[in-house]
Amino acid sequence: MTSPLQILILGHGEMGHAMEFLLKDRYELGIWEKFPSNDYPYVTLEDSAAHADIVLFCLPVNPHREVAQFIAPLLKKTCLCVSIAKGLDESGQTAAQIFAENLPVQQPYALLYGPMISEEIRTGRHAFAQLGSQDTAAFDVMQTCFNHTRLHIEHTFDITGISWSVILKNVYAMAFGMADELKLGDNVRGFLAVAALHELSQIVQAMGGKTDTPYHLAGLGDLITTATSESSHHHELGRKLAREECNDISGEGPHTLEMIHQHRLLNTQKYPLFQMIHAIVQNPRDVRPQFETYFKQIYRQ
């Protein structure tokens, strides 16, 4: 009889708790937290990384580089590193790019992206994701981990495509929150879904992703979830911006806008909805007129 997989969860926030909920009954879990409390038996990276079969990075993207560099010499050659981070770090890189640069060349890694609201996972509801990896072996491992749960996963080789799909959806989700706060109506919400997906698809292709990737779980699926859920942080950010509130406008979406601008990752002139959102995040004033100007720009009225 084979021993159960040893899984190391990095980060014990919302998604760390969700992964713990899904995996705790069948696997040996160790959980590492950078700022541990005294009421949980957290592990240390030094002791746990060397024994892990899977390392789940349930962390924001910014700490990925430091943590990956620290554990890289400790990992077994077969250990699979998986990230759920949906953002860009301070150098403008995705989690996949950080893994590729900082893990050993042959170290397997994957990205897990899709509509996975932590609160719903922890109440036993269904969730869905794409696992992006360079081969199907990583998918087989993760599918085995989740096949007794209500987290349903499918495989894709398009790591670049799902990375940018899930990063950009946080930007576009804010527009839905703005529109809802301004009570622009259901027709506008339908239009925004089409316009956002159109631009998202163009940007993903420009970044090297495949044409159809934005129309799957990491793109359209996660966009709709984030853009329409009242519990969504980025939907609420959009509402705050529409109210012309400037305080605490933070999150992966605003940070993505900042990194794309700072590192010149994208020619934003081609994407008017993206440009409008960026302008509002920078200066949340006259949001309703900016929507009107945007609609006129699109239809040349």
Segments from the language model and where they lie:
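NAD(P)+-binding Rossmann beta1-loop-alpha1 motif at the extreme N-terminus of oxidoreductases
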Residues: 1-51, 70
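Short gly/ser/thr-rich secondary-structure transition/capping motifs
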Residues: 37-43, 111-112, 155-156
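Alpha-helix C-terminal capping/helix-to-coil transition sites in glycosyltransferase folds
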Residues: 50-51, 168, 220
